[in-house]
């Protein structure tokens, strides 16, 4: 039979695993409170919750002159970094 400490540890690890699997994906939308806690800026764009509209607009302007990679893809670090990472991609990869 497991001790009380063992059961508590097991439940904590189970909750941690569930929380990580729910919020760990890059495509998940985070709440305003979560973004505020991590220093992120809210945005209307689902694929770039940490990127401002100005950053996305600048990315589109930078990529518009590229003959192959003329679509802009903005992403964030799913580990919680508030950095906005924009780069040019082929339109079909968007």
From Swiss-Prot:
Expressed by the venom duct. Residues 25-44 form a propeptide. GO terms for cellular component: extracellular region. The keyword Signal applies. Its main location: secreted. Keywords: Disulfide bond, Ion channel impairing toxin, Neurotoxin, Secreted, Signal, Toxin. The keyword Transmembrane does not apply. Residues 1-24 form the signal peptide. It is found in: Secreted. It comes from the Eukaryota. GO terms for molecular function: ion channel regulator activity; toxin activity. Probable neurotoxin with unknown target. Possibly targets ion channels. The cysteine framework is XXII (C-C-C-C-C-C-C-C). This is Conotoxin Cal22a. It comes from Californiconus californicus (California cone).
């Amino acid at each position: 039979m497991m001790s009380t400490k063992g059961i508590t540890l097991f439940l904590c690890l189970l909750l941690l695993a569930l929380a990580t699997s729910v919020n760990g994906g890059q495509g998940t939308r985070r709440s305003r409170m979560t973004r505020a806690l991590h220093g992120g800026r809210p945005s209307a764009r689902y694929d770039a919750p940490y990127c401002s509209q100005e950053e996305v607009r600048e990315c589109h302007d930078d990529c518009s002159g590229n003959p192959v990679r003329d679509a802009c893809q903005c992403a964030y670090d799913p580990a919680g970094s508030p950095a906005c990472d924009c780069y040019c991609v082929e339109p079909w990869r968007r």
